Amino acid sequence: MKMKKITALLLALAMSLSLAACGGDSASAGGSTPAPTEPAAQTSETADGDGQAVVLDENGEVYAEAEDADAPTEYPVTLTDQAGREVTIEAKPETLVSGYYISTSLCIALGLQDQLVGIEAKADTRPIYARSAPGLLELPSVGTAKEFDLEGCAALAPDLVILPLKLQDAADSLAELGIPALVVNPEDQTLLEEAVALVAAATDTRARAAQLADFTVKQQNRLTELLADAERPNVYLAGNSDFLSTAGGAMYQSSMIEMAGGRNVAQEITDTYWASVSYEQILTWNPDYIVLASDADYTVEDVMTDPNLAGCKAVENGNVLQIPGDAEAWDSPVPGGILGSVWLSGALHPDLGIDGENMQIINEFYETFYGFTYQEI
């Protein structure tokens, strides 16, 4: 199984913890919209004249030295965000606004929840907030990516705002008001790693980010070793709103299946993101497992009793599953996204008897980064 390549930025953060990951192809977009046409800033790893490993930005300038990758951020600091914008932060941010669920979850994982003074709308629909940072539910809302409250955000006078790529214009407007705003775009594993590195550098939490990277890489390596000789069952992953919508090979969810020791039956679909298919196509694929997205609008029972799937191997054998979403959606590029592969590996390979160990790993993650165990839910 190919490993997901850890980006140079995240390697710099985590090298002091002696991380090692095998190279491989990176997943592409994990959302329902195409990936941005403007690429994130690129970095590369090399060595200076003394043999010290360094990370260079796209201009060939030193971004960070590996041995200091988890050292405190020195301010003022100028960073290039995932929209290619240069953002200067004069002093360590004491107050933050996050206009995006994934960046809010990341802030919690980095220990920044008490610095948040405003977050995205519909916080009460995020179980992980109530468990790990219930105070977030009382914070002012700054709206959504479709209806962002620029005036309300500015009124909070935050030291730093973190927004998704869709709100790049809002980030520019905030900058004109003298409020630094970072744009993040964690739509696949590599971009998620870059987003973690970016936010960590901006908020002086690089040591915590290295700890998060360490956990992720250890689980990638563990799954690779465990599943090296395992047969790969064919998996159909059904989308949130429509069973006949599936994740093609260019999506984050496809890499999740691969890491879990499965084969995405739709992996050859690369010219789209959530792709519409027919029942006939599913029957032709005849998957061993059907996996429903964590936020699916339909149930496992709906699929099991669907007459259009009569004769499908997964249905006949009772191998229709739904990705858990009790804490957050593991089939999306959140800080705990690796847990989707951890959980799915046990479901696809019951003969390995790793469910108990997997649950220990899941509990360890949430206890370490969010302050609760998954079994408490």
Feature names for model-found ranges:
Residues 5-6, 11, 22-105, 207-237, ...:
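Bacterial Sec-exported substrate-binding components of ABC uptake systems
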Residues 98-156, 160-162, 166, 265:
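A short, structured surface patch at a secondary-structure boundary
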